[in-house]
Amino acid sequence: MSITVETLQATSIVPNLTVDDVQQSITFFQALGFAVDERWEEGGTLLGVMLRAGETRIGLSQDDWKKGRDRKKGVGMRLFIATRQDIDQIAARAKAAGLALDVEPHDTEWGSRAFDVTEPTGFKLTVSTEQPA
């Protein structure tokens, strides 16, 4: 087995999710505490947004359905969102805004506190406190 040496000094990774209904997904992420940072429209139609929460960004793009309507999105992928904020308060705000949590806030085996939730298109998210050093 060979060991590779890190040569890329990346400063961030920004996922862009292709969603079924961009406005519905915006509402979902706003319930988690994200804010719209940029919007892209064409002819009055919302094509996508860049959301921001703290130092992180997530892009949302409206599916144009050119690849068909029967394809599954979000399969085999989970977004982990780490925060220094109180997980129980974030979960309570999300629930008050109408989100249904998949897993309620709980202590994890690696020492953080987390909850799970699914975005309307099917993308899975875990919102967690940062792992202890």
Give the ranges of each region predicted by the language model.
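C-terminal catalytic core of tyrosine-transesterase DNA break-rejoin enzymes
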Residues: T121
